[in-house]
Amino acid sequence: TGARVWVNVEGDAGTPYFRDSYGASSLTDISYAVQQVNFSTNFSNSNYCFVSGARAGSSGGGGRVVIGYDQPATSYFKYQMRNLGNNNEHVDAACLSFFGDM
């Protein structure tokens, strides 16, 4: 089966937003470089798989970013983008896909 949810997030804007998405109802801007993807339909448990990729934005970071995340929930996924110095960083593009039972 394909991804149950996927998002392409513009994270370098003043307020992050979905460039495009599937299976996500909204994006919540928590704080600097911390967002929450809210799912249209809940996963059956919080053991779903996610994959991500990102491109560094205007805030720098040497073009290298990693994702940090909180404990996954069935109805949302909260994440933050970090540079190699382990500091939160805005990114030009954050792409996340989620796989699991709904």
Question: Where would I find each of the regions flagged by the language model?
Answer:
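Terminal beta-strand-rich extracellular "head" domains
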Residues: 45-71
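Extracellular receptor-binding modules and their adjoining Ser/Thr/Gly/Asp/Asn-rich linkers
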Residues: 1-45, 76-102
